Amino acid sequence: MEKNESSAIEIAESSKERKGKAPLLAAAVGHDRAAGYKRGVSIFDLILRISAATAALAATIVMGTTEQTLPFFTQFFQFRAQYDDLPTFTFFVVGMAIVTGYLILSVPLSIVCIARPVAIGPRFLLIVCDTVTAVLATSAAGSSAAIVYLAHNGNSDANWLAICQQFNDFCQRVSGAVVAAFVAVVCSS
């Protein structure tokens, strides 16, 4: 060898150094677009779920606290309107309370779907339970909407009088609760 030349000496790796290294046989794994899409849908689902829970809770509270008393001639003789005077409104309060409870309790499962977007089990369970609660919320809101319509307009064929001329505050609160329930139905569907 001459002065300017250098030579490389190869030293074999010990068995300790080789254990921690794996040979590179595959290319780097790219970003999975399907998982990103599912994560985005799950985030949107969580936002809608929280919105529906808020609307359902508001509808339940407003309907459950609705009452109005009208004095008639004296203080001892009064007309009183409460939500529980009509079984449809009682069904509304119970049904929307169940929907609210489910929507609040399903938020953690929705978060699991965000963290693990490819998990099929939690997503399927949410779809089935969401369908059941959407039907319950729709039936509660629809039946109450029919009674609110009768309260506003009456039915001359059945000789039912409109009561909203006398119980204006009661009718306004009940109408607001029904609108909030339909908002919850749209958000939870």
From Swiss-Prot:
Q: Name one GO cellular component term.
A: plasma membrane
Stretches in topological domain Cytoplasmic = 1-42, 112-130
Record's bilayer topology term = Multi-pass membrane protein
Which keywords does the record carry? Cell membrane, Cell wall biogenesis/degradation, Membrane, Transmembrane, Transmembrane helix
Task: State which ranges are Extracellular (membrane side).
Answer: 64-90, 152-189
State the oligomer form and interacting partners.
Homodimer and heterodimers.
Q: Which family does it belong to?
A: Belongs to the Casparian strip membrane proteins (CASP) family.
What role does this protein play? Regulates membrane-cell wall junctions and localized cell wall deposition. Required for establishment of the Casparian strip membrane domain (CSD) and the subsequent formation of Casparian strips, a cell wall modification of the root endodermis that determines an apoplastic barrier between the intraorganismal apoplasm and the extraorganismal apoplasm and prevents lateral diffusion.
| Localization per record | Cell membrane
Q: What is this protein called?
A: Casparian strip membrane protein 1
Record field: transmembrane: 43-63, 91-111, 131-151
Record GO biological process:
cell wall organization
Organism of this sequence: Striga asiatica (Asiatic witchweed)
Q: What is its main location?
A: membrane
